[in-house]
Amino acid sequence: MPIITLPDGSQRQFDNPVSVMEVAQSIGAGLAKATIAGRVNGERRDACDIISEDSSLEIITAKDEDGLEIIRHSCAHLLGHAIKQLFPNVKMAIGPTIDNGFYYDVDLDRSLTQEDLDAIEKRMLELAKTNYDVVKKRVSWQEARDTFEKRGEPYKMAILDENIERTATPALYHHEEYIDMCRGPHVPNMRFCHHFKLQKVAGAYWRGDSKNKMLQRIYGTAWADKKQLAEYLTRLEEAAKRDHRRIGKALDLYHMQEEAPGLVFWHNDGWTIFRELETFVRTKLKEYDYQEVKGPFMMDRVLWERTGHWQNYADLMFTTQSENREYAIKPMNCPGHVQIFNQGLKSYRDLPIRMAEFGSCHRNEPSGSLHGLMRVRGFTQDDAHIFCTEDQIESEVTSCIRMVYDIYSTFGFSNIQVKLSTRPENRIGDDAMWDRAEDGLAKALTANGLSYEIQEGEGAFYGPKIEFALRDCLDREWQCGTIQLDFALPGRLDASYVAEDNGRRTPVMIHRAILGSIERFIGIITEEYAGFFPTWLAPTQAVVMNITDSQADYVQKVTKALSDAGIRVKSDLRNEKVGFKVREHTLRRVPYMLVCGDKEIEAGKVSVRTRKGADLGTFTIDEFVEILKNQVKARGLKLLGEE
């Protein structure tokens, strides 16, 4: 006679074991109709699963985040159902959920085309609209293997052979004649899976290993209702317009090429943005009392073994050899900063020491994961490490948090998600060390009034971390800033200071990055601003143009005045109509266009227009120089006339 406790604290008693759906039906027909699955004692379960003992239960509907994920997972099975009908010889591999959707890896003897995707999507919709029930059956390991052997599914058999214990009872989900294997849960009926869209096909190696066969990965998105799907597709269209790769090419910011995968060739205008970001961060380093250092980009393997990187991070490290010694190109800056700290005796009176570097790092990311500036192999971190005592942890982490919010606000980011990532399975240090480190970060977050989400097992191998994720104008999340507490690395590298009692102590090390990878941050703000960089960041801040040749000397005079004032300015003296010039520089997202005609020369002024088409009227040269200097100095986000 299980007693079921509901989220509001009310209880329901049943004479016999009861399914999640039956509990929902006992509450009301409306809830039963909306039920996708349940959360039994915090664990997600199918609607058909039986509850035989006293339990807490929360019904999952399409309004819940879990409900939407289940819909997406079931759409992956629906994709399998449809593609099997259209291509009976296809072999199904894996079909998990991802952000905003799902994918399925399939093995087919020919490449899928857009026409194929359209046909698969059409068949999926036809099947879903029959509103068939999804039937879950638990079977023995052998029965599951026999099922997939009969159906000619080698990848499902491999999953059983390599990933599932022989004593397990795998769940098979029956979609009419199609059968898939999954942990679940899944929707009880396909009426929940009417709103989806197949998006693209890409290559993917089986199990992510390039030694294995290349499969075809079909991507899709799925939502709870028609409106959500339409809104998402609109956001995708806007994201495509804002794609930093497209804008980067149009604005001549950078390029990448096959001979240097994951490495950036910065062009003049892109490098201008890069240097402006460095300059801005340097002003903040001075404000928050950091010293700036520079470490070598490569160090001996022996050092990386002492830090634990060689054992825990080797797959992502580039290595080289010289004179019978093995070196690693640094994937991060922290070991080098400890070496700088170790030069000379340090006292507790010297702490905290805040050490910052624009460190050039390299990580051997899989080629399939590389994506423009967002995922690269060579990048520059606005990295810092703070050496302090345990008593200083909370105040130093608080200072880091303030610096994070200070810097992000300059770029207009105010919606910031905070996450606390705890100890991973593969780590250094004992549990007592991790307890202290996790507790230290949690206390600092609480003291600063920040709500946060805990990410179990997502910390670095050497310490837990706070992550700051930015929400952009398209409601996408970008993880940028991190604050990590490290009790292990300084001790491994023999860092110490003389304490107040004259004894030797190991300092605590706080790892801190705000922009994260500068390359990636440029990609993020390129998309956030759609290439319309605020004046202080714009590679060219103003263009001065003539109407006829007779104004050429005056244009040069205005250009020189702006350039002498530190404004990034160009002159355009081409023999083209002024409207043509304005359009061209508007497409280049230049903030201000200064037009010089005979009237402007006579008045000693310039006529000013913005890239958004606003006519600001006329200004004397000195007036406009002063206005622009002040705007750049303030690092404002808006142009004149946009206030």
Swiss-Prot record:
Cofactor(s) annotated in UniProt: Zn(2+)
Gene Ontology molecular function, alphabetical: ATP binding; metal ion binding; threonine-tRNA ligase activity; tRNA binding
Enzyme Commission number, as recorded: 6.1.1.3
Signal peptide residues on this chain, from the entry's feature table: none
Stored SUPFAM superfamilies: Class II aaRS ABD-related, Class II aaRS and biotin synthetases, TGS-like, ThrRS/AlaRS common domain
Predominant cellular place of this UniProt entry's protein: cytoplasm
Pfam families in UniProt: HGTP_anticodon, TGS, tRNA-synt_2b, tRNA_SAD
GO biological-process terms attached to the record: threonyl-tRNA aminoacylation
CDD domains to which the protein is assigned, alphabetical: TGS_ThrRS (cd01667), ThrRS_anticodon (cd00860), ThrRS_core (cd00771)
Domain TGS: 1-61
Annotated spans, Catalytic: 243-534
Record's cofactor remark: Binds 1 zinc ion per subunit.
GO cellular component: cytosol
Residues that, per the record, bind Zn(2+): 334, 385, 511
Keyword set, alphabetical order: Aminoacyl-tRNA synthetase, ATP-binding, Cytoplasm, Ligase, Metal-binding, Nucleotide-binding, Protein biosynthesis, RNA-binding, tRNA-binding, Zinc
Source domain of life: Bacteria
Subcellular location: Cytoplasm
Catalytic reaction list: tRNA(Thr) + L-threonine + ATP = L-threonyl-tRNA(Thr) + AMP + diphosphate + H(+)
Quaternary structure (record): Homodimer.
HAMAP family cross-referenced by the UniProt entry: Thr_tRNA_synth
The family this protein is said to belong to: Belongs to the class-II aminoacyl-tRNA synthetase family.
Main function: Catalyzes the attachment of threonine to tRNA(Thr) in a two-step reaction: L-threonine is first activated by ATP to form Thr-AMP and then transferred to the acceptor end of tRNA(Thr). Also edits incorrectly charged L-seryl-tRNA(Thr).
Protein name per Swiss-Prot or TrEMBL: Threonine--tRNA ligase
Taxonomic lineage of the native organism: Bacteria, Pseudomonadati, Pseudomonadota, Gammaproteobacteria, Pasteurellales
